[in-house]
């Protein structure tokens, strides 16, 4: 499920931020976390980023396919493309007047 990799990633972010801030102070951690990119096994390219403008996690592996109840469990897996996701997000924000 999503919560397991998301929580593991959150711990990785906090660990890296504490190292960079040399502190566990919440305000210092928040400053370091903003825009931070870390190495992560769940990243599409081996990294994930805490986007600076809205603190959204981006760059994680995403994909889809047909699920089945036996191995390989997912047929015709297609990897998501973050370039396309960012383009669609920008179009949506513009259509809603957010940009």
Regions found by a protein language model. Give the residues of each.
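Extracytosolic ligand-binding ectodomains
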Residues: 1-99
């Amino acid at each position: 499920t999503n919560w397991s990799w998301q929580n593991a990633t959150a711990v990785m972010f906090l660990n890296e931020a504490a190292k960079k801030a040399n502190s566990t102070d919440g305000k210092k951690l928040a400053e370091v976390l903003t825009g931070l990119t870390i190495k992560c096994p769940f990243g599409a390219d081996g990294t994930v980023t805490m986007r600076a403008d809205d603190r959204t996690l981006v760059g994680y592996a995403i994909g889809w396919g047909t699920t089945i109840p036996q191995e390989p469990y997912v047929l015709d897996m297609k990897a998501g493309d973050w370039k396309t996701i960012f383009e669609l997000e920008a179009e949506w924000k513009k259509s809603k007047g957010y940009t």
